[in-house]
């Protein structure tokens, strides 16, 4: 089975099989936390405007712009906040700067799209392995069009675990991600050095980084199940 890592989304990229979308700080971590809190479904929209179109008393709007909760949204993009949110049985509509856009890029061609992070790394890798017939691709959201150390490190953790689950043929991007993972024995160190973590510190949200650095603490894997309008519908596997 081929193992591929793309460090940022690209319009020219196509995915024939399974894609693990990674935005570890913070969207894919927060997505798993919402499912842990009992959310029925996650609607991932490509823009804040398309998210606001779903605004309703039975819907929770969550997201960020510049790291902060957007106007008229109910919640930000904090996994700590998500885990304690009153979302049981409810739909959570999410829009973020990088993660939701990466998911839309993957969904253009992939058979299966999963949201992965360190938080649900082992569960996400196992499910990807079960679903894949020819390739598992790990798509890093990056930060505003640039590669992110945090996502690349997470891709390395996923790639390593996929290798433990069975024989894989890593492409160059996967080899780079594995090298990054091996260079940082401590997940928190790797994430803390990233531009995404530094940006959170600037807006006083650095406490989210240790949460995002937890490895394999959740079995909740958001899987793409359909669409409504511009939104991708993710539910727990």
From Swiss-Prot:
Taxonomy of the source species: Bacteria, Thermotogati, Deinococcota, Deinococci, Thermales
Gene of this entry: comB
Single GO MF annotation: magnesium ion binding
Species, as recorded: Thermus thermophilus (strain ATCC 27634 / DSM 579 / HB8)
UniProt enzyme class: hydrolase
Catalytically driven reaction(s): (2R)-O-phospho-3-sulfolactate + H2O = (2R)-3-sulfolactate + phosphate
InterPro entries according to UniProt: ComB-like, ComB-like_sf
Protein name: Probable 2-phosphosulfolactate phosphatase
A Pfam family assignment: 2-ph_phosp
Assigned EC number: 3.1.3.71
Cofactor: Mg(2+)
Keywords: Hydrolase, Magnesium
Keyword Membrane carried by entry: no
Keyword Hydrolase (UniProt): yes
Signal peptide start and end residues: none
Similarity comment text for this entry: Belongs to the ComB family.
Domain of life: Bacteria
